[in-house]
């Protein structure tokens, strides 16, 4: 009997190909056209997206990307490639492909790469620790569309999330302890997660609970008193209410009330990107310091650290 050959598909959000208005516009158009991300009726959304949002946001966002762009491309792409290569090095007999929901390399190119390696079974690991319909759900949807076009469909194991997985929590805790050793223990450790519209949660998305699960387990692992840890949500977009409290408003409040030393971690980001390196490490630092805060440090994402790769090995092991 032929032994099953398994491949691993690491999935993440995606990134523009270049820090230019044209490349950013292409990326944002694909991203903001996904109903999992924005579910506004199309007759209302298309004119707003194409006539207002893309022309206005693309040049501004391109400048932000230019401020963080690396020699190998966008940080998200650089670190994602490093993750793929590190995991592949640990699993020499298992093909590992990288696919993005938006931009390049696409999820379809990743599936094709694995099928070309003659795999019978694909383990899909969306690198979103906390499930949300707007992230993990988008990977699920696109995977279904891709496979619907294939004559040969492999077996699929889909890892929904890993918000309270012990290897993930241990990796976060080690990263936080290293930051504490470098900068001193902060007055407040702020855990900033990407926000979603409150309406999504009201309609059944359990993302807020999965963020709370991560926060609870991380606080326990670090042995910090609850009053020294805060959970907030960043990157809100549009006018409808998003999950609260908002990260920027919380940092302003903490600075104004005299909190001296803040360290910020973004547990929901598996790789550093625009939202961490520019929004959190730069914009929100300024907000806190201008409000009266004294010391601010951003704790990097897990990226391709050995502990993060160990976690990926553990999560995929039952399916390999």
Curated annotation (Swiss-Prot):
It is an enzyme of class 4 (lyase). It catalyses: heme b + 2 H(+) = protoporphyrin IX + Fe(2+). This is Ferrochelatase. Monomer. GO terms for cellular component: cytoplasm. CDD domains: Ferrochelatase_C, Ferrochelatase_N. Catalyzes the ferrous insertion into protoporphyrin IX. It comes from Salmonella paratyphi B (strain ATCC BAA-1250 / SPB7). Fe cation binds at residues 194, 275. Belongs to the ferrochelatase family. Pathway: Porphyrin-containing compound metabolism; protoheme biosynthesis; protoheme from protoporphyrin-IX: step 1/1.
